[in-house]
Amino acid sequence: MTILEQMNRFSDRFGKQVVVNNTTWRYYRLGVGAPIFWLPGGLRRAAFGFAFLESLAAHHTVIAPDYPPAQTNDEYITAFDAILQAEGVDCFALGGQSYGGGLAQVYLTHKVKSVERLILASTGPGNYPKAALPALNVFITLARFLPEKTIKRLMTRLLLKLITVPEAERAEWREAIDTLMQNDLSRADIVSHFAVAADRIHKDIVKPAAYQNWTGRAIVLSSENDPTQRKNSIPRYEQLLGRAVTVVNMGDLGHTSAFSNPDKYVEFLEQALV
């Protein structure tokens, strides 16, 4: 089956939804065992991770949402609460990959009594500096006013730069992402991508004081050849979270190892979940 066919199959088998403030939030629940709430990256559709999510579900209950074009972090928090309530989950591991890692750091500020461990994969500290706001505002303006075909093409290029898969599979992944961008995502989704990050800065959500009452563990999964990783990320995480951070080195698997080598990726995740 093609990637898109496998995504559709995954969605049909495990897809569920909740309606929160007149917005439909689709999500997926699969597996048995201790729950992990997994927040996907900037592709905005958890089904892109069908292979690793099904593998992870062999020993864990996995819950992973899609992202509608919400414009604020509060909307995400409210929806995530509704999803977990619908599934009867009170205590859980919280994970996020890339863009989802930033959302995970936000959600943890709201769930310090419920999250036993935070797993951050191929992402960075979410306390973005105020100096990032002008650039984010430029991206938001471009997303709102450029022709939709143009902004979708630019967003596709941005996402493809981070997709690390074997060369033989790259054309199929490009087709899947192009199809998603043209047929599923809207201009509002692209605005949301940047607006939520700007909202995070404006409201000063991610900061050391927000984690003072959290008693859980923090684990970072990082690849040496991931362009989003920085040498100072671990010290910044430790300063932000107020505790030592366990690092799981994924070698040279790149930014999207969940796509390129899902079984190996789950091995690393299992280390973080022990």
What is each stretch, according to the model?
Residues L53-S55, N213-D252:
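Conserved loop-alpha-helix segment in the C-terminal half of the alpha/beta-hydrolase fold
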Residues L253-P262:
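Catalytic histidine-centered segment of alpha/beta-hydrolase-like enzymes
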Residues G101-V112, L118:
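Short glycine-enriched nucleophile-adjacent loop
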Residues A93, E116-I119:
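Residue in the alpha/beta-hydrolase core beta-strand immediately N-terminal to the catalytic nucleophile
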Residues V20-Q71:
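Conserved HGGG/HGGXW glycine-rich cap/lid loop of the alpha/beta-hydrolase fold
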Residues E54, I63-Y99:
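Active-site loop/oxyanion-hole signature of alpha/beta-hydrolase fold enzymes
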Residues L118-L146:
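Flexible "cap/lid" loop of the alpha/beta hydrolase fold
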Residues P129-A131, K149-Y211:
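Conserved alpha/beta-hydrolase catalytic His-Asp/Glu region
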